[in-house]
């Protein structure tokens, strides 16, 4: 009898799903195309900026970086900036908005300690509901946003939210394969629904071994903004959170405005922190190539750049290999010229 019941269930359950899917399609209004003139005359509200010029209203964005570089420090600070209406680094905040920050990784005590330090520069400007935190460490079983059930569980918290920050994809969507593009579709559909509801979303993610965002590139297709954090060439661990901010995608910024990369760093000040920014220095390789092109020797370049002679020699060889320089002679200190 049991095999018969199992066979019946194997037929009934898919049939029910098919019927439900058809009913859902039939319930939708018919599709309607709009003519070009009618479309151009539609009164569509312009998108204001949440964090100008990189995060507009109703945007989908990603911030990614290698582990331990400081992406959560930056994501938390971006959220507090929007939630308090306070500028951050080289970005302005036209007006205060409501932010929900969903953390899927940090222990609760670490998250609290970090937020205490980050919140000091913002003073008392942040309304209590301007920046709200949902931490997986407070929830038995954590948070699984790769399932419809997990997505629905956020609904009561999204009513007045302008910006939703998900930190990070690996922990909040752990049930989904990072490399399988089809597995991303249900999450992408949910994100697009949030955008239609005028909720902006910032995804925090890890970089892979190749330096790109880890997993399927399909994630980037609907995104308005993609921000990559990279380690400076002269970085050392004792410097803490110090990184280069690069903008790999800024949709609708055809003039390149706001897309200029820069360096950001954090320093401890009393019980809080302070962010600072600076223009990017030319990469060490480019600096060395320019000095070699001026006729400097390996020893002179090493002294000018405050690096070892062996490092200067390696940079010279790499510049030659990459075609940045062309040697006229074959000795170590032979003159070179720019290719």
List PLM regions with ranges:
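Short, small/acidic-rich helices and loops at N termini and domain boundaries
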Residues: 1-28
